[in-house]
């Protein structure tokens, strides 16, 4: 590929030192780095699970990965919630400016224990995008449009799903039957699997409404719910999942545990209106990778020159 993104949960809480945390990330990114593929990452809810022990938080991870020659992460927008919120622009084949935009968003980790003395029992207890992140997107999107004398089409990536992902599967806020899903398939052109509940935060961030208003983002894709692979056309914006690429996270269980290990491929074509030409799934099985393997401890990969 011309670019690769790891969309959160790059590592889990296993590292017991800063060195182990760096080694874990290095093991993930070396295949891209060694092939000279530009790459970036977003953060998921598990990337800081070992921070209390290792001292490595998201800001430290950004500083670390920026040492890699082919990494394109930046420190991100200043003064807003999260780490590494940024927009990467792709130049057109002819001329200057931005031909396409890749929005990388930090969807956070977990909801706090309480707000106003009330806990989150009975509600999804993951994190959510904050109003300052939504405002940053709106302002940055408008600035891109001014500089380019027209909207810049793009895709957005964050780890934790929006509430609208859940709505799309059933074409409903409340109804959740097989008949509702059948209606949703026809209405929203749904493709792929849903093997677990969507796990958004307890509050709707309003980011989908903001992107719908701006009209530039053609799709928003997430991870988090590792065994979902579906994509839906939800009122003109694709909402979808990419499957877990690594074999260490939970899978389907049993003989099919690793069946959905894979990645999502996105195609851009300047000859297509809006540049975005579609997406498809690629699974490990498609490449003859052994799906029966278990977790196999091994020596960590060496750091490239200039990375420590």
Locations of the language-model features?
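Short aromatic-enriched loop/helix-cap "lid" or pocket-rim segments at secondary-structure transitions
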Residues: 52-55, 116-117, 167-171, 253, ...
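Structural recognition of the beta-strand scaffold that forms the well-ordered cores
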Residues: 2-7, 12, 38-43, 48-50, ...
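Extended active-site neighborhood of metal-dependent phosphoesterases/phosphodiesterases
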Residues: 21-149, 263-267
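Binuclear metal-dependent phosphoesterase catalytic core
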Residues: 89-91, 198-199, 206-214, 226-307
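Active-site environment of divalent metal-dependent phosphoester hydrolases
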Residues: 12-15, 41-53, 110-113, 160-166, ...
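His/acidic metal-ligating clusters that form di-metal
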Residues: 2, 101-104, 118-225
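N-terminal active-site segment of His-dependent metallophosphoesterases
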Residues: 1-23, 27
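Short, flexible loop/turn elements at secondary-structure junctions
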Residues: 92-94, 106-109, 162, 221, ...
